[in-house]
Amino acid sequence: MLFRSVVNKPRLGCRQRGVPFTHPLQSLLQCYQCAKHDEHTSYGELGAAVPPFGCAFSTVPDMSHVLAVANEEGIVRLYDTECRDVQRLVVKEFMAHTNAVFDIAWVPGEHKLVTASGDQTAKLWDVKAGDLIGECKGHQCSLKSVAFSKFEKAVFSTGGRDGNIMVWDTRCNKKDGFYRQVNQITGAHNALDKQTPSKVKKRKPYVRGLAPSVDSQQSVTVVIFQDEHTIISAGAVDGIVKVWDLRKNYSAYRQDPVPAKLFPYPGNSTRKLGYSNLVLDPTGTNLFASCTDDNVYMFNATGLKTEPVSVFGGHQNSTFYIKTSVSPDGQFLLSGSSDHSAYIWQVSDPKVPPVTLTGHCQEVTSVAWCQSDFTKIATCSDDNTVRVWRLKRSSEDSAQSDKTETVGWACQKKCVPPSMAANLCTPGKPSMIPSSSLMSSPTPATCAPSYTGDLPMPSSTPVSALLPIPKLQTPQRLNGEGLGASPKQTSSSKISIKDWITRTPKSSTRADTKTPSPRKAFTPVEQYPSVSSTRVQMPYEKRAKRRLETSSEDVEHVCLDHCNCVMELEPGLKKAKLDLCSFSEKERDGSDDKCLRLSDLSRGFDQEFSPGPSTSFLINGTVNPPLSPLSELKSDLRDKENSSPEKNWLSALGHKFKSDKSSPQNKAASSPSSRNSTSKKHPTRNAPNSPVSVPTTPGSMRKICTYFFKKSE
């Protein structure tokens, strides 16, 4: 063989004690390339390009160069990889299924193959004549995998999405025109329920014709034969590789089947992940399991240990369509990847960076290494192409490849050392952080867990997290520094949580003034001297007004165009608030009413209150003018969030005030001239010592500012 003559060729001047130095195979992996004539597009029935799902080289000695490819539309094509004539490249083509073919397997040493399709059937074909030999029915969902035993040409196994593993024997007679399974493992990879041994969940008996629920079953993604009596399988969710003894009848038990041996999930993920493919080396000792956590685990299939012997990484496995293959001598492992490349690892040294076969523009799914020729590799991709990679074995082939357009090449993947990974971290700036108790850099803490598989890398730390942190101050301290100084404008991407809470859909970010804290509604309100008639518009005036229902149907709150009513509550506050209305300067000059301060309310209204005509309030950092009698009568609003059916002194006082309003005395007392007569009847209006049992309804609740005002005696 030409390849062996190149590999075993001794190096000149390197002979030592009669033993020649040979070329290491690792150095030859970078010589793989794919020429333009070795790229084949997979077409469907109507001529449209469709992705290929499975490929496999023939096991017949005189047809080992024939590659079988099955695509998404159920078409199987046989390619002659040694033929350079485009017209004679496709040896055979036939429609195997009316649905997608997910896996394909050759009968050992014969011109036959079996296809596993999404139409819930497996079919045995004679590839020379293109005839259907038999059809296998029994699965209730799509078939995902099919495998033959090396020791039996008539026995093969299938696994499907219904969670069942079925064994078929083509030597049995056909019943109803198709084959029936000779052995079945139902629920092979069901999720283990947390239950006591005394309460074992019994499996429902199988009813023919009734498809099991896919939600209650766990899909079997791959099955292979270890020997004529042993099957190895893997699932999509449980993360366990199970070994089954076919000499045991698993259908006779009503509980979930128990495997003869299992390999638990060895990864560091917080949840168990499934496997997309299983493959054994030529000796049958090493088992390679391709997991969806971007690792390929190698187990010792003949030993007693269940921990992986080696782990191969560097690629990406995000789907269950990615397959693996082993070189004919068992020294190298080939796998597809989601990053548009195929990877080759050295089995004896997993730490060596893999060799990548680059050229596809989509995910590389199924791969196959020709078992009779080390220099030939086939890859399938979602870019609707099948590529055959060849090894440049001489200078003549290299010169010929220069004339031909190359669409794929091999290269050694660069390994990032741990020191460079640490340099990718965002540098810390402790000088910009005033507090020494905060973390000065994104370096993990000492007590942080060792596993960071589900955590972001240190290099992903945003730089904005290292910006200077403003001083933590209370609202009173912020006001003490000066109300006139406006902070820097905050961008929409750096709005604090407090800004999001106090904003409305139509309001913009407060850039001129700092957002007042919702807790300021409960702080004592101080009096300030009279302000100018030109009132500065505060942020709350720009908020969208929301009309609330009135306390009664006959009283309606009418807001003028120049009224600055604050009728929207701060989100998250369930406490009573003030509802103040401020009118224009013309109405403010003509009003001579008298209002109380909140400090007087807290002292129980024991002190006399006689404010001047220019008395104002400061609520939430906003200077408001005093209330007028008209505003007191027209601000009869019912707060939906503040209303409460609890009977207290405030509700009793409101009920009494409502009853007084309906009397003729209150109607006469609405004018300023009749206040003296009404004030004599009610000299004081202090809060009662105990609550009065008066029926309270949400409609009787009124604003607190409408109840308290001094009557001139």
Swiss-Prot record:
Q: What residue ranges carry the coiled-coil annotation? A: none
Q: Which UniProt keywords apply?
A: Biological rhythms, Chromosome, Cytoplasm, Cytoskeleton, DNA damage, DNA replication, Nucleus, Repeat, Ubl conjugation pathway, WD repeat
Segments annotated as WD repeats: 47-89, 96-135, 138-178, 215-254, 270-309, 314-355, 359-399
Pathway, per UniProt?
Answer: Protein modification; protein ubiquitination
Q: Return the Basic and acidic residues bias intervals.
A: 635-644
The Polar residues compositionally biased stretches are 504-516, 612-623, 686-699
What is any Pfam family matched here? Answer: WD40
UniProt-listed InterPro entries: G-protein_beta_WD-40_rep, WD-repeat_CDT2_adapter, WD40/YVTN_repeat-like_dom_sf, WD40_repeat_CS, WD40_repeat_dom_sf, WD40_rpt
For the motif DDB1-binding motif, what are the positions? 168-171, 244-247
Query: Which cellular compartments is it found in?
Result: Nucleus; Cytoplasm, Cytoskeleton, Microtubule organizing center, Centrosome; Chromosome
GO BP terms in the entry: DNA damage response; DNA replication; mitotic G2 DNA damage checkpoint signaling; positive regulation of ubiquitin-dependent protein catabolic process; protein monoubiquitination; protein polyubiquitination; regulation of cell cycle; response to UV
Q: Where is this region: Disordered?
A: 474-544, 604-623, 635-700
Q: Which GO terms describe its molecular function?
A: chromatin DNA binding
Q: Residue ranges for motif Nuclear localization signal?
A: 197-204
Q: Which residues form the signal peptide?
A: none
CC per GO annotation: centrosome; chromosome; Cul4A-RING E3 ubiquitin ligase complex; Cul4B-RING E3 ubiquitin ligase complex; cytoplasm; nucleus
Keyword tRNA processing annotated:
no
Q: How is the subunit organization of this protein annotated in UniProt?
A: Component of the DCX(DTL) E3 ubiquitin ligase complex, at least composed of cul4 (cul4a or cul4b), ddb1, dtl/cdt2 and rbx1.
Family statement drawn from the similarity comment of this UniProt entry = Belongs to the WD repeat cdt2 family.
Q: What does this protein do?
A: Substrate-specific adapter of a DCX (DDB1-CUL4-X-box) E3 ubiquitin-protein ligase complex required for cell cycle control, DNA damage response and translesion DNA synthesis. The DCX(DTL) complex, also named CRL4(CDT2) complex, mediates the polyubiquitination and subsequent degradation of CDT1, CDKN1A/p21(CIP1), KMT5A and SDE2. CDT1 degradation in response to DNA damage is necessary to ensure proper cell cycle regulation of DNA replication. CDKN1A/p21(CIP1) degradation during S phase or following UV irradiation is essential to control replication licensing.
Q: What is this protein called?
A: Denticleless protein homolog
Origin organism of this chain? Xenopus tropicalis
